[in-house]
Amino acid sequence: MQDDLDGIVRHRRRSLSFLQIVTLTMAGLVAFDPAQVLAGHPTTDSELQTAGSPRPPGLEHCVDQEERRVARRLLYISTLDGRLSALDIAKSGKLRWSVPTGPGPLISSSIHRLELTNNGQFVRMIPSLSGGIYKFDGDSIDPIPITAEHLLSSSAKFSDDLVISGGKETRSYGVSVRTGQLLYECSLNGCVNSTEEGLAIDDTIREPDEEDQLEDGEQLRDEAGYIVRHDPLLDDVIIVRRQTQTVRAVESRTGVERWNFSVGQHELDLVRPSECQLQPRDELELAVLDVDIKVVVPEGIICAFSKSEPQTMLWKYKFDHPIVSAWNTNADDELQPIDLFSSAQWLWDQDENDTELPNAPQSPPSIYLGMYDKQLYIQESIRLRQEIMDQTKVYQQLTGDTSLMPRIPWKPISASSKSLVIFRKDQEDPEMIAEGAVAQGGELVPYDDENFAVAAQSVLNASEFVNGNGFYFYTTGDLNGPQECSTQNNPTDLPAITAPTSPTNATSEGTEATGNHSVNDDLGFSLDDIDAPVKVVILSLWFWWKEIVVIAFTSAVILNIFMGQRNQRVEREYLVIERHVPVQTAIEATEASTQALLGPVVPMQRPGNRFSFPPGQANQRTISESTTHSGEHYTSRFQSDFELMQCLGRGGFGVVFEAKNKLDENRYAIKRITLPNKESSRQRVLREARTLASCEHHNIVRYFHSWTETPPTGWQEEEDRKLLAHELSTSIQIETPDDSTMPSLTEQLKEKRQQQLLSWVSDAANSTACSHDFHLPGESSLKNIREEYDYDEEEDSLIEFRSESQSAALRAEEEDDTDDDYEEDEEQQGDHEKRHRSSVSIDIHSASFDLKNINYSQHQLVSNSFQIESVRPKSSGSDDANDDNKARRKPLTLALAQNHNNNQNGSQPTPSSATILNGTVAKPSKVYLYIQMQLCRKESLRDWLRDNRSETRAAHIGDIFHQIVDAVDYVHLKGLIHRDLKPSNIFFSQDGQIKIGDFGLVTDMADIPNLVAKCGDQSGLPSCARHTQQVGTHLYMSPEQLLGQHYDYKVDIYSLGLIFFELHVYFSTEMERIKTLRSLRDGQYPKDFAVNYPQQYDLLQQMLSAQPEQRPQTKQLKSQLRNILQLPHLLSEGQSEQAELAERARRLSRSRTFSSSSEPHQ
């Protein structure tokens, strides 16, 4: 028994010894790290430090699924837009997941636009992502010993009118490494857990396909096909810490923000299950350790290379935003950051055997300067950031020399792949990192001094040249340090880093480095001036003594030359005056003053179209002055740049031509307007060009260009005669009788119908004679005026004050009426002889003649003169008197001298200057304004209404009126009033689109006074045109305009109502149109209109209301028209705007039936 027990004991002892040996062997295998042997690289200091640290106890091999250990092969990337992304290194860099972080991008700044001035040199402020501030003056980038924390805590350093606000915010995120699910988010407001059922990742079952079969290892799924949810006990978690620093500077009085910047950075930490620590790596995970990651920061490119074969690129991935940071796991399953600045050396380390490449620098760059979304920012290396923090502490204590702050000269190295070296798998297969980039010979793209200056100026001005690009920089210590130790490892051998320096520069740099610097010298500007956008630092006024002397001397010389030329011009003006002529001045324009001024009016007796004075005036002296300018060498820009095609007629205040540009061969509408000499009147005429230039709407005539011309006197008139000879038929006399070739009065009466010049030839303003009665065709304008003012046959005289254009227009109307009633006048000659009137027209220059008690300041004159016409009734005394009055029916025109003196007592007149040569008046040269506009069809909306009946218009009324209202709405939104809306001012473009033109009467709403005089008051001018507020076509003017009351933009609504009515009603004759519209203004609608158009009738009641406040606005009008006329809505799906315009043009073309195809009018 004893022997059996002893045998059992010995057996147990052997078993325990064997178990102990096995345990020791296993412990040795576990302590030995096979990854270092398989990876084939020596152990680094960080790995030794990590290996020496104690590991927490845990279970071995607790997780068998490969996807649970996916953190070992992921690459974490932080981009500038604030997102954190994960790339699978083993899956050719495929994007595993990407999560955003708040509150937004890592950079949001306006401080880079803050321009400070240091002794006349601009200084640009650039923030860094770590919270620091740098200043750049074009020569160097210098750190400022101020951070965001200092700005928020030390407000006493700034001026009293600046308040600093902001803060530092930290947000933490928990992200599942395997699924990319956002587990929680913690901020100042608390933590939000996203693992509830409603916020969990959306797991759906999809039909298995080839893509799913290829990505079986992409996500861990259960038997039912669902993605396995995050397990906090088994899955790894990435802790993302987002630190954001925000600083805002605002004015203490107004609260206006001067500048701001907000920067942020990401910090990552990997949390693994505490029970699963000692897990072996498989072959795929061991291969991941052999991958070297390189980064192209500005382009967001990640490149993976093999450590064993550095020239072989495994894969590449490109982000849409620049890269800020990158992390991966090491052999100890711990996160380690990737040095982005080592990528600058990596480019030159790829091909060390190439003799053409210079030696690469041995130290990484210090900072990176980039631009993102037009915002400059800086990233520092860890070494430089620590050095700046140490020097900042010294600066705050004021115990050290501030010159020890690191200085970074402007010697950039491009960080873009467009200047990288070619990487080759073999000698015949070049491959670039950036697609589309081209390299030659495998060499670096060097920077020279010119490229340095261009890049520096672009950064200083924050231009688009550097937007999306980036540069690396070295500090002065990095550039100078290797020269003292070893010249072979000098990084300045690279052409992209150094530039040749002269011995003088070297000496000055050495002096600067060893000299003493103050705080302001180190900063380059005072801290009190950082709040100002632009400030100039001037130590003394004597600093600019050279500039002051040059400016004073130059100003004296220019002033002396200008005054000398002005005196010479004045002398030349007086030298042309040869003689004086006595002229009687008038206080009031009456018949007595006219006779005293001119003497008895007698018919001309001298043949040959010359003036004949009475014998009593034979002793009067005559003067002669040559003021004519030769037009032989004058060149008109209109004639040199354009080829005249035809005259389109009158528009606004001038003549409209169709002309083809000789350069682009396109046809345009050119409007020519004569500018008045009076400055206020000239500005009102220029208003049309300025209004067209400021309007950009598809239903308003397009404006291209404008210019002015000042031809010699008589040159433009001669060109107009040539034009008329070409345009008009030979049956019409086109020659304009002037003052020197005036025919006899008897011949004028016989040839009155043939000696007409079309009103649109002269560039005078439209006739705006005031009359509440509209002149109908066939009625005499002279009869209307006589009836309006209740003229009596026994009245002695009538004196009318009109501009030249008004007199010309009135005479043209009289002549037209005389032609129509010629036969009737012959039958009733006895009656008409009693009413024959003789008139004397006196052309007085408004610039030099003054009539008291007459206010002409508000009269808008296109010409610089007006006429006094003395109209006397005909007496039936004798035949001689009848003949005399017949002869005086055509007015004589005499030009009085300029600069008359008032003679109230009627004594001997004082001599004045005159410019008369051979009986003609020498007028000053006219200034013409040319406006180049879009060429529309010659037919206007008035022609379209005349040639299309109501049934033909029905399909187009809504489309046409909608475009008109849309254009008027745009004009009102710009604060303007058209004031002359009528069918003749609405045109069609070449593609049939509505175009509103003729902005000659447009005005600003703010320019209208609260009170205007009524039309035809007692101020001396019976014309509505005396006020710019009382203009436009009378038939379409609102009641408040006609009554001279205050008005606003509602006058255009009234005109739109009349146009809207015309679109629905067809008029067979012009007489019917005018009578119907005049009745409509009085509230009388045509019979059956309210029955046929009930909705239109209700709308017109509002638009034509006598009370402006009852008229709708354009927005309300468009809303009502949409329901009434069924206006076109948005374009149908798949139909382009061009197709819609083409269809509209075809519809309008089919509806237009002009004279060749229209029905005969009744």
UniProtKB/Swiss-Prot annotation:
Cytoplasmic side: 559-1162
Major enzyme class: transferase
Glycosylation, residue list: 193, 260, 353, 461, 505, 516
Keyword ATP-binding: yes
Parts of the chain on the Lumenal side: 40-537
InterPro entries: CC_SR_Kinase, Kinase-like_dom_sf, PQQ_b-propeller_rpt, Prot_kinase_dom, Protein_kinase_ATP_BS, Quinoprotein_ADH-like_sf, Ser/Thr_kinase_AS, WD40/YVTN_repeat-like_dom_sf
CDD domains on file: Luminal_EIF2AK3
Entry protein name: Eukaryotic translation initiation factor 2-alpha kinase
Gene that encodes the chain: PEK
